[in-house]
């Protein structure tokens, strides 16, 4: 009997990436609206990517069975 392939969640595939060591990378959150209230340094620091914590990355990896 053939094993069934597990599907990867498309939404997770678009938002997160895995490093070579297995850490989960995502873009910084909280940059959609309300930027007028924030300081310029805060806005600047939210550019780029961030590495997710242990508990969050475990959840993301459940939805990416083949580490795409």
Curated annotation (Swiss-Prot):
One of its GO terms (biological process) is translation. PROSITE patterns: RIBOSOMAL_L35 (PS00936). SUPFAM superfamilies: L35p-like (SSF143034). GO terms for molecular function: structural constituent of ribosome. It comes from the Bacteria. One of its GO terms (cellular component) is ribosome. It holds the Pfam family Ribosomal_L35p. Keywords: Ribonucleoprotein, Ribosomal protein. HAMAP family: Ribosomal_bL35. Belongs to the bacterial ribosomal protein bL35 family. This is Large ribosomal subunit protein bL35. It comes from Wolbachia sp. subsp. Drosophila simulans (strain wRi). The gene is rpmI.
């Amino acid at each position: 009997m053939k094993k069934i392939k597990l599907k990867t969640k498309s939404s997770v595939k678009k938002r997160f990436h895995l490093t070579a060591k297995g850490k989960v990378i995502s873009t910084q959150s909280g940059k959609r609206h309300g930027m007028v209230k924030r300081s310029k340094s805060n806005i600047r620091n939210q550019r780029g990517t961030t590495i997710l914590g242990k508990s969050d990355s475990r959840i993301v990896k459940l939805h990416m069975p083949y580490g795409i």
